[in-house]
């Protein structure tokens, strides 16, 4: 059988890939959960390891011919352990949510109480949202941010924990721009006899390079995705203390998954190697510097930021003073060539399909090589679009400015 190229086999998919490449090349991507994977990561993910079934774990497979799959998984495990300084790693979860699921299924029973950050305050679906499996299987309690400061209300966290005695407390968020105090969460968890799980999906790259305090000394379990600030393939990882290793491993397989995606694990291993480099540390420094520069520039232009700024890779913009919705802002900015996402803000009165805010992140633009000067220009473009949201002429002018920046900073 002659192996044909994608272009020969499926012109439609080939064309869509080219169109997506054009979109990513010619627009400024500022969705905080997105990034550009390296060529090396994509080569590994597109490798012939996609052909291999490897149920089980290295040295304990249910299929023959796994000698190289074993080596790939061992490399990924050892690199992740080195990167995060943890005792045990499982690199098989297909996603961040499945990594979270592994912890829940290993340590909880249906009907147990979990406590996480409210989705509308910046949390994640898999931390107890009623539309997620967590909200259906477990009793859920939500903490949020202080209405005045925009910071996590640790007094509320302690009060709710003491009142409801959750079995597990989840820290981590999808739209929280400030440093998370893992030590304070740990103290509260110990007070009420709860496990502490840190979901670091958004800030894993920052933690790996010491740009954000690590949850490792304080947490029983740590979960993450491998994309976002880690800049790897889409996937998940569970890390834990050695005493929980067996429970986690048997929950991932055979508990909630079958065969691992060896090609994705290979790509994870590559991403971990990249993340161990000095270049990656410099990259993370620039991600934060760019975020702070952009946040300050937007504030000077009259934008209100939740918590009045950022400590990490993202900011949450409150658009209520401009009398437009997050949905309207997302659509207008995309026309100009800047891709963000509508996002609820704490105490939002609008539904999540509309929202009063937008979330903006700097990982992707920093990967392209943009710096503080470009953040000032991007702030200006955002201002012009938001203040002239119905003016097609202004939006076309801003589109030209976006194109100039994109040409100056190619991706691949």
From Swiss-Prot:
GO BP annotations, alphabetical order: glycine biosynthetic process from serine; tetrahydrofolate interconversion; tetrahydrofolate metabolic process
Modified residues (N6-(pyridoxal phosphate)lysine): 228
Keyword Lyase: no
Residues at the site labelled Plays an important role in substrate specificity: 227
SUPFAM superfamilies: PLP-dependent transferases
Biological or metabolic pathway of the protein: One-carbon metabolism; tetrahydrofolate interconversion; Amino-acid biosynthesis; glycine biosynthesis; glycine from L-serine: step 1/1
Organism domain of life: Bacteria
Function summary: Catalyzes the reversible interconversion of serine and glycine with tetrahydrofolate (THF) serving as the one-carbon carrier. This reaction serves as the major source of one-carbon groups required for the biosynthesis of purines, thymidylate, methionine, and other important biomolecules. Also exhibits THF-independent aldolase activity toward beta-hydroxyamino acids, producing glycine and aldehydes, via a retro-aldol mechanism.
PANTHER family documented for this protein: SERINE HYDROXYMETHYLTRANSFERASE, SERINE HYDROXYMETHYLTRANSFERASE 1
Protein name: Serine hydroxymethyltransferase
Organism: Thermodesulfovibrio yellowstonii (strain ATCC 51303 / DSM 11347 / YP87)
């Amino acid at each position: 059988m002659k192996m044909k190229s994608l272009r020969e086999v499926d012109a439609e998919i080939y064309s869509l890939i080219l169109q997506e490449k054009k979109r990513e090349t010619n627009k400024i991507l500022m969705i905080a959960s997105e990034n550009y994977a390296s060529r090396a990561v994509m080569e590994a993910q597109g490798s012939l390891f996609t052909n291999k079934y490897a149920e089980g774990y290295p040295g304990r497979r249910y299929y023959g011919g796994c000698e190289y799959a074993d080596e790939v998984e061992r490399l990924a495990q050892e690199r992740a352990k080195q990167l995060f300084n943890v005792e045990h790693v499982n690199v098989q979860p297909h996603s961040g949510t499945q990594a979270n699921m592994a912890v829940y299924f290993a340590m909880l029973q249906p009907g147990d109480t979990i406590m996480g950050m409210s989705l509308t305050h910046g949390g994640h679906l898999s931390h107890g949202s009623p539309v997620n499996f967590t909200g259906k299987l477990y009793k859920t309690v939500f903490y949020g941010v202080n209405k005045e400061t925009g910071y996590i209300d640790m007094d509320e966290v302690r009060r709710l924990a003491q009142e409801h005695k959750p079995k597990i407390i989840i820290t981590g968020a999808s739209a929280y721009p400030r440093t998370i105090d893992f030590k304070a969460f740990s103290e509260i968890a110990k007070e009420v006899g709860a496990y502490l799980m840190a979901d670091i999906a958004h800030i894993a790259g920052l933690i790996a390079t010491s740009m954000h305090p690590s949850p490792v000394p304080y947490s029983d379990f740590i979960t993450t995705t491998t994309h976002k600030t880690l800049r790897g393939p889409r996937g998940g990882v569970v890390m834990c203390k050695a005493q929980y290793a067996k429970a986690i491993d048997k929950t991932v397989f055979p508990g909630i998954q079958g065969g691992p995606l060896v090609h994705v694990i290979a790509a994870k291993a590559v991403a971990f190697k990249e993340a161990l480099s000095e270049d990656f540390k410099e990259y993370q420094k620039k991600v934060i510097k760019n975020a702070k520069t952009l946040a300050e520039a937007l504030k000077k232009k009259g934008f209100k930021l939740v918590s009045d700024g950022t400590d990490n890779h993202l900011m949450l913009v409150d658009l209520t003073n401009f009398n437009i919705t997050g949905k309207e802002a997302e659509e207008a900015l995309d026309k100009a060539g800047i891709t963000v996402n509508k996002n609820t803000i704490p105490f939002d009165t609008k539904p999540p399909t509309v929202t009063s805010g937008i979330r903006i992140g700097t990982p992707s633009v920093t990967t392209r090589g943009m710096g503080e000067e470009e953040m000032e220009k991007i702030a200006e473009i955002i201002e012009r679009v938001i203040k002239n949201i119905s003016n097609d002429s202004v939006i076309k002018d801003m589109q030209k400015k976006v194109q100039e920046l994109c040409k100056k900073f190619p991706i691949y």
